[in-house]
């Protein structure tokens, strides 16, 4: 017998590899996900709180880890599995392989982190020609042979690696020959014939017979689940979702209960709340006379869960009660799989339900208002990526496209998507890599499609319901999906989709409304969403908890306004160079300045640029009224402002004003060309070589600040000098800026408060931060350049080798996306420590791309930064990450 249920299973489970569970008793509990996987831990938990769970056992993730290391069944494990099997047989009064009292098993995977459709499942294990005859005697021939043919298909595909399509061809051919549409119309005699054909597939595909010994079937199935951990699709899913550090998958072996025993049986999947909208109402699907995989795999399009009320009222009432118990117990929205066998309800699985961004925020806010959780728990419940989804665009005018709707499916994952039609996952990835937006159109998706699904802007399937593979994966990613669109027929071979009287080809534009299920012909305009309602309330809780300020990188008044609307507490980086590209007049003046050989000529060009800069700064100060604005002086190499193309084209363009001869221009271009421009003539080196450039920018800032102050706008300008490597560089630029300030203030007969600070992006600057802090009133880490110079990776060329580094495990993440805490992070720690030793009130922030990446934000909060600055659209994500690090 298994040990009785206990709540501290982890402490007593040292060395244990096989864990039992059944109603009212279990070896494990919900805290043991690392060891039992999410599925196994939750089965143990459901059993121990008294829900009807078919008895079974879980083989631990550590056993999988041992198998991966040895590439063989670990010593003694098979004996432990057989002992657990004997316990299950005793509980059920049935025996694996006994025709008189047949026990059938399911074998499922389950890692610590849910990976929908990534791992392999085998149902009805234990059937062979003898056992099926005994099962037929007890439960009817049709049920028995339907179970047998399903098992042959699944076992062949999952364990023996026989393509599912070979089995599908046989059943489709039989239905066509008999003039039938549905599998359920096949008779017992038809199914017997199909079983014979399926067994022949084994011989044709593998050159060997189907293994009829049930214990051999179990042995092979356990190994197949272990092997599925390293399958290409599982690796790809983990890579896309940045899932690392797991030991492997657990194996859950459970006695089968049957939803395909007639009209008093069925199977379903539900969420305790709507995962798309968060509405507090059971949301799910149900199939009468079916097995669980039929719902999840999208093989049959199921009915709404509400239909169960009428056909199975008692199991439905028990199910509703179980959902209340589970939500109250886990304090979470739960995803539940269940089966009804001859009017008896069985709970097969529960896990925390995947949800959209909209659903996540509403569920969190509602659960606080219901008194189920507190605000801090609500903040932990919403993931940064959920906010990313909520900030996705919607259609500008949903009412205007009514006449363009060509089909309607199920609204499987909300949001809007616009793209060109592709029919394969590979094409979706290839087109996406070329910068194209695509809609992946499939009859149904499978786990092999995850790469293409991730690359696509949206997904459209002809078959499958709200809990099909496509729907679950798309919702997890916040990707728009319309599923079960029966009005379309997909022809993969011809690369066309038929919709009513229309034939749509690869490359045609399609728009999807994942909130309504509408499929719209053509390319509709999209508009950004807003922070309001539940999201506004949730973000106010976030701001109560976080200590780290969140600013935005914004170069235009429009960007600044977006940042402010998204809750930014200032501008942490305004890149002045972007302003020079916004009109032909500006870029011409900039090129005139670059081509100038004398201070006088350069000053003429700078005088032309001054009003443009001043105007832009005024707009940004106005948008950020009352909040600080950090302006970085010119940073990029000057050659970036020259026309693109070959030298002859450049010369022709630059000489069109007849100011310089072609020879003079050619000489100047040659002088500006650099072998390694990112480490060359840029940043403060420009301002030191051309002090008049720094002077013009400082003057524009101060004049704009005074102008706005006179109009009643509260202005807090902060001037940031880029690429500082020595205190002498900063001292020279500070002198220029202060001299300009005095002149502007004298002319205007007024003064304003301002700060001068330094970018810390050269590793040397981090190491001598105490010397730089003597002159700088604030630091801002430019983590893009700091990463580039610390690793010695050119950001422009890293794509040539980074994919290899990631695939070989040399790097775990792209260091330009996820901040390197160990190496570059050490420089940040040193700079903060030394800088504050010299200037205790030193304000320190970061303004690289890492400012909006959640794990990076958590690190910056821990090392004592005052703020992070990120793109305007990532501000809410950074705010949430900054709050979560405090919990």
Curated annotation (Swiss-Prot):
**Where does the chain bind substrate?**
575, 632, 761, 782-785
Enzyme nomenclature, EC number: 2.7.9.1
Q: Which SUPFAM superfamilies match?
A: Glutathione synthetase ATP-binding domain-like (SSF56059), Phosphoenolpyruvate/pyruvate domain (SSF51621), Phosphohistidine domain (SSF52009)
User: Mind telling me which NCBIfam families this protein's record contains?
Assistant: PRK05878.1, pyru_phos_dikin
Name its species.
Oryza sativa subsp. japonica
Q: Which residues are annotated as modified residue Phosphothreonine in the UniProt record?
A: 467
**Sequence positions that bind Mg(2+):** 761, 785
Q: Which GO terms describe its cellular component?
A: cytoplasm
Checking Pfam families in the record gives: PEP-utilizers (PF00391), PEP-utilizers_C (PF02896), PPDK_N (PF01326)
Protein's name in the database: Pyruvate, phosphate dikinase 2
The entry's localization annotation reads: Cytoplasm
Q: What class of enzyme is it?
A: transferase
Cofactor(s), names only, from the UniProt record: Mg(2+)
Membrane-spanning parts: none
Query: What is the catalytic activity of this protein?
Result: pyruvate + phosphate + ATP = phosphoenolpyruvate + AMP + diphosphate + H(+)
- Give the residues annotated as active site: 469, 847
- Miscellaneous notes: This gene codes only for the short cytoplasmic isoform of PPDK.
**Annotated family:** Belongs to the PEP-utilizing enzyme family.
Q: Which UniProt keywords apply?
A: ATP-binding, Cytoplasm, Kinase, Magnesium, Metal-binding, Nucleotide-binding, Phosphoprotein, Pyruvate, Transferase
């Amino acid at each position: 017998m298994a040990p009785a249920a206990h709540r501290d299973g982890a402490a007593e489970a040292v060395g244990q590899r096989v864990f039992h569970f059944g109603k009212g008793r279990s070896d494990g509990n919900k805290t043991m996900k690392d060891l039992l996987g999410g599925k196994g831990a939750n089965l143990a938990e459901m059993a121990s709180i008294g829900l009807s769970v078919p008895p079974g056992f879980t083989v631990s993730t550590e056993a999988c880890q041992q198998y991966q290391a040895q590439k063989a069944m670990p010593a003694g494990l098979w004996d432990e599995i057989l002992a657990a099997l004997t316990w299950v047989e005793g509980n059920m009064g049935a025996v694996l392989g006994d025709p008189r009292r047949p026990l059938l098993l399911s074998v499922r995977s389950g890692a610590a982190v849910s990976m929908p459709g990534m791992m392999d499942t085998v149902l009805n294990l234990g059937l062979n020609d003898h056992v099926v005859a005994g099962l037929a005697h007890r439960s009817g021939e049709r049920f028995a042979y339907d179970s047998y043919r399903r098992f042959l298909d699944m076992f062949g595909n999952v364990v023996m690696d026989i393509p599912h399509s070979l089995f599908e061809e046989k059943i489709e051919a039989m239905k066509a020959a008999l003039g039938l549409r549905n599998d359920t119309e096949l008779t017992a005699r038809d199914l017997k014939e199909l079983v014979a054909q399926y067994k022949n597939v084994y011989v044709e595909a593998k050159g060997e017979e189907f293994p009829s010994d049930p214990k051999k079937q179990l042995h092979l199935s356990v190994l197949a689940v272990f092997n599925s951990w390293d399958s290409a699709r599982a690796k790809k899913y983990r890579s896309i979702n940045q899932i690392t550090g797991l030991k492997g998958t657990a194996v859950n072996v459970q006695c089968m209960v049957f939803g395909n025993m007639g009209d008093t049986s069925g199977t379903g999947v539900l969420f305790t709340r709507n995962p798309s909208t968060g509405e507090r109402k059971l949301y799910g699907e149900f199939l009468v006379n079916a097995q669980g995989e039929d719902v999840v795999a999208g093989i049959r399009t199921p009915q709404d869960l509400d239909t169960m009320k009428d056909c199975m009222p008692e199991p439905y009432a028990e199910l509703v009660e179980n959902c209340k118990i589970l939500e109250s117990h886990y304090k979470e929205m739960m995803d539940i799989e269940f089966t009804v066998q001859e009017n008896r309800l069985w709970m097969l699985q529960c896990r925390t339900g995947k949800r959209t961004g909209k659903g996540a925020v509403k569920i969190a806010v509602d659960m606080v208002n219901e008194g189920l959780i507190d605000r801090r728990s609500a903040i932990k419940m919403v993931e940064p990526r959920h906010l990313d989804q909520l900030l996705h665009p919607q259609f500008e005018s949903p009412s205007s496209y009514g006449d363009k709707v060509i089909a309607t499916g199920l609204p499987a994952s909300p949001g809007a998507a616009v793209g060109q039609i592709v029919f394969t996952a590979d094409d979706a990835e290839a087109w996406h890599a070329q910068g194209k937006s695509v809609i992946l159109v499939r009859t149904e998706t499978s786990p092999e499609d995850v790469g293409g699904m991730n690359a696509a802007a949206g997904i459209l399937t002809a078959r499958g319901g709200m809990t099909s593979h496509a729907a679950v994966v798309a919702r997890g990613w916040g990707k728009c999906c319309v599923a079960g669109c029966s009005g379309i027929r997909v022809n993969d071979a011809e690369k066309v989709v038929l919709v009513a009287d229309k034939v749509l080809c690869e490359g045609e534009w399609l728009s999807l409304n994942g909130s309504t299920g509408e499929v719209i012909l053509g390319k509709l305009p999209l508009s950004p969403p807003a922070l309001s309602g539940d999201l506004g309330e949730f973000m106010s809780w976030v701001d109560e908890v976080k200590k780290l300020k969140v600013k935005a990188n914004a170069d235009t008044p429009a960007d600044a306004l977006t940042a402010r609307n998204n809750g930014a507490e200032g501008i942490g980086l305004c890149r002045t160079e972007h302003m020079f590209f916004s009109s032909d007049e500006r870029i011409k003046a900039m090129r005139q300045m670059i081509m100038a050989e004398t201070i006088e000529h350069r000053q003429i060009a700078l005088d032309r640029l001054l009003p443009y800069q001043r105007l832009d700064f005024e707009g940004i100060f106005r948008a950020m009224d009352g909040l600080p604005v950090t302006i970085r002086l010119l940073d990029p190499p000057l050659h970036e402002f020259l026309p693109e193309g070959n030298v002859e084209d450049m010369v022709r363009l630059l000489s069109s004003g007849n100011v310089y001869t072609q020879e003079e221009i050619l000489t100047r271009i040659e002088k500006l060309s650099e072998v390694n421009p990112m480490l060359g003539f840029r940043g403060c080196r420009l301002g030191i070589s051309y002090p008049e450039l720094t002077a013009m920018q400082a003057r524009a800032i101060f004049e704009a600040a005074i102008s706005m102050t006179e109009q009643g706008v509260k202005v807090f300008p902060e001037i940031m000098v880029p690429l500082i490597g020595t205190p002498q560089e900063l001292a020279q630029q500070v002198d220029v800026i202060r001299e300009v300030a005095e002149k502007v203030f004298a002319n205007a007969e007024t003064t304003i408060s301002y700060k001068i600070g330094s970018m810390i992006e050269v590793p040397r600057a981090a190491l001598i931060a105490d010397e730089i802090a003597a002159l700088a009133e604030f630091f801002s880490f430019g983590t893009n350049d700091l990463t580039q110079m610390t690793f010695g990776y050119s950001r422009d060329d890293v794509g040539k080798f980074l994919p290899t580094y990631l695939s070989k495990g040399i790097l775990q993440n792209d260091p330009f996306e996820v901040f390197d805490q160990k190496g570059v992070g050490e420089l940040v720690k040193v700079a903060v420590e030394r800088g504050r030793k010299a200037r205790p009130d030193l304000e320190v922030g970061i303004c690289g791309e890492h400012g909006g990446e959640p794990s990076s934000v958590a690190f910056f909060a821990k090392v004592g930064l005052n703020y992070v600055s990120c793109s305007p659209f990532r501000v809410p994500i950074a705010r949430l990450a900054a709050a979560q690090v405090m919990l």
